[in-house]
């Protein structure tokens, strides 16, 4: 079949524009397609059709897209794309077409996201309940520990108060009763007792040497034998101390009674 006058005009116009391939046609402006579509008959404008160059286009009701599959050029159902809003259900998309209707896929994605978010919320609430249940024993344990520590502190405070009161009765029964004053008085009292013990023990702690000479082994034995006498002490039989049992010790050691307390039964060595 020979080319018609309209086909020759379209080819001449494409050659004038420098379009030689399909890629250049896609990158080119819509002027060529619009010019080619102007030559179509008015009855086919609403339904779409095929121009003289073999390109498929859709009408006003559908999306204006191209389909490059040569096997579907004679099939009216595959030539025209479905409208953007489907009437019902999810339609299968033609892999040979450029246009991809993602509205249904977005709906599916939103459904998946909503289900995931709901499951996350459920799991989150479950984990929160479990965490609360796990935290409750810890709080109870802390409260029990605090109560036990408070009870121990009270017992220690009571014991300390009792000891302070007993110490206050010893050092200053009619003085101050606060802990600081009682401890201060106790320190002074202890120092006084230490000084008294040192004064009373000083005569008995002096070591006397024999004439200031060198101490030999024999002298050491004699010093050990006279150790008590050298320290001002002596051994007295129990029978000689019977008359001192009912008397006052201070009067017994007074100078007035020292001469009358000598017993003839005492040995000469004492």
UniProtKB/Swiss-Prot annotation:
Coiled-coil portions: none
Complex formation: Homodimer.
Gene: BHLH113
Localization of this protein: Nucleus
Gene Ontology biological-process entries: regulation of DNA-templated transcription
Keywords: DNA-binding, Nucleus, Transcription, Transcription regulation
Keyword ATP-binding: no
GO molecular function: DNA binding; DNA-binding transcription factor activity; protein dimerization activity
Domain bHLH: residue ranges: 144-193
Superkingdom per UniProt: Eukaryota
InterPro entries: bHLH95_bHLH, bHLH_dom, HLH_DNA-bd_sf, IND-like
Primary location: nucleus
GO CC terms of this entry: nucleus
The protein, known as: Transcription factor bHLH113
Chain intervals for the UniProt region annotation (Disordered): 109-153
């Amino acid at each position: 079949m020979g080319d018609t006058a309209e086909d020759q005009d379209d080819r001449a116009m494409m050659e004038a524009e420098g379009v030689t391939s399909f890629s250049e046609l896609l990158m080119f402006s819509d002027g060529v397609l619009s010019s080619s579509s102007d030559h179509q008959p008015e009855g086919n404008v609403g339904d779409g059709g095929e121009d003289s160059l073999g390109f498929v286009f859709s009408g006003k009701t559908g999306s204006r897209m191209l389909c490059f599959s040569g096997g579907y050029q004679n099939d009216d159902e595959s030539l025209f794309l479905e409208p953007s809003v489907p009437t019902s259900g999810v339609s299968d998309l033609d892999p040979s077409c450029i246009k991809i209707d993602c509205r249904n896929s977005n709906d599916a994605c939103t459904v998946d996201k909503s289900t995931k978010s709901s499951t996350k919320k459920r799991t989150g609430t479950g984990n929160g309940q479990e965490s609360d249940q796990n935290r409750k024993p810890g709080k109870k344990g802390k409260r029990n520990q605090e109560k036990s520590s408070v009870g121990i502190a009270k017992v220690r405070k009571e014991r300390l108060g009792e000891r302070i009161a007993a110490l206050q009765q010893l050092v200053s029964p009619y003085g101050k009763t606060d802990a600081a004053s009682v401890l201060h008085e106790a320190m002074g009292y202890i120092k006084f007792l230490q000084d008294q013990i040192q004064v009373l023990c000083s005569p008995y702690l002096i070591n006397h040497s024999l004439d200031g000479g060198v101490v030999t082994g024999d002298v050491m034995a004699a010093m050990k034998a006279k150790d008590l006498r050298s320290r001002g002490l002596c051994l007295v039989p129990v029978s000689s101390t019977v008359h001192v049992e009912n008397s006052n010790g201070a009067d017994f050691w007074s100078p007035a009674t020292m001469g009358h307390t000598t017993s003839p039964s005492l040995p000469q060595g004492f």
